[in-house]
Design a protein with these regions (language model features):
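Short, surface-exposed alpha-helical segments at coil->helix boundaries
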Residues: 187, 246-249, 273-280
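Alpha-helical structural signal in soluble globular domains
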Residues: 193-196, 251, 255, 278-286
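ER/Golgi luminal nucleotide-sugar-dependent glycosyltransferases, focusing on the catalytic module
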Residues: 1-225
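Short internal beta-strands
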Residues: 262-270
């Protein structure tokens, strides 16, 4: 559902899966289950990494070797979520003001309507909702692990509010991002609900460090591009050297042996999409030449390589 963003998966899980706990990580964001791991955070209280590698999953205790540890931690709490963002430090705005500032994509009147719905249908949440929206503490991304009973109650509350919102608001003139308004509201609603639980229910909770990975593509083992007569040619390059390699490939194409298949592989870390398109254009309609691009960034993320 394009309107509900990641909440689409949450709704499906609510309606189709019966488990003891429900958990969601989204948009290359993960919680670390290693309490002793202390890394530098940005102003948004997030640890940012270039690549999600085995090194990171091991350090964060989120690979298969730590399943028992994860299970034990989850069993001890009703809710696990991210360590919150201090918006005063990050941008100097409250939760409400931050939403209002994003006036190009979002409309603050929608946040006001959401608040009206809470007041009308769930008045016991209203004061907490106002406190959360007017405060500087934020929980983003709908990222959490929650016990079944709480999750079911949360989803019933959440989707009832969003359903009522869609009845009241005409989004037909909204931008593509504007259509995602229910998903954006859902982020704020999680913070409100979590804050309400902390203040009104005797729950146990734990807040974990949030990590963001710019690239989560895995490095798969390369196989030959052709099943026979495969001649591999590996090249190390970046965008700066692309024109020189284009000249080299042009020379190769002028001297091809029709009895051979040429498997050209660029080992790179930062080729732009346009660069790749231009290389592939060189071999258009040439059946015995393939060009592939292999991002080696994850392999060398924690290596110190010096060029002389």
């Amino acid at each position: 559902n394009p309107d509900y963003c990641e909440l689409t998966a949450q709704y499906w899980a609510w309606k189709n899966i019966d488990v003891e706990y429900y958990g969601f990580f989204h948009y290359r964001r993960y919680l670390s289950f290693n309490d002793s791991l202390k890394e530098k955070v940005d102003n948004w209280n997030i640890v940012t990494k270039n690549y999600l590698t085995k090194y990171e999953t091991n350090a964060m205790h989120i690979d298969n070797r730590y399943l028992k540890q994860i299970e034990n931690m989850v069993d001890n709490y009703d809710v696990l979520t991210m360590k919150p963002i201090d918006l005063k430090k990050a941008c100097g705005l409250t939760v409400y003001e931050q939403y209002k500032k994003d006036g190009v994509r979002l409309h603050v009147k929608d946040l006001d309507i959401m608040l009206e719905i809470i007041n009308e249908k769930y008045s016991d949440f209203y004061d907490i909702a106002k406190e959360y929206l007017n405060g500087y503490t934020a929980y983003i991304g709908n990222i959490f692990i929650m016990k079944k009973e709480l999750f079911n109650s949360y989803c019933k509350w959440l989707f009832d509010i969003l359903n009522e919102f869609e009845k009241r608001v005409d989004m037909s003139t909204y931008s593509v991002e504007g259509y995602r308004t229910p998903g954006h509201l859902g982020e704020r609603l999680f913070g409100i609900y979590y804050m309400w639980l902390l203040n009104n229910r005797n729950i146990t909770s734990k807040e974990l460090q949030l990590y963001f990975f710019s690239n989560t593509d895995s490095c798969k083992e390369l196989q030959p591009a052709f099943s026979s007569r495969n001649i591999p040619i590996a090249m190390v390059s970046n965008d700066n050297y692309a024109p020189f390699y284009a000249a080299m490939i042009r020379s190769l194409l002028d001297n091809l042996n029709d009895n051979c298949n040429y498997d050209l592989v660029f080992l790179h870390r930062d080729f732009k999409k346009k660069t790749k398109e231009l290389f592939l254009k060189l071999i258009k309609d040439i059946e015995n030449v393939k060009i592939r691009f292999y991002n080696v960034g994850p392999l060398f993320e924690h290596s110190n390589l010096n060029a002389s």
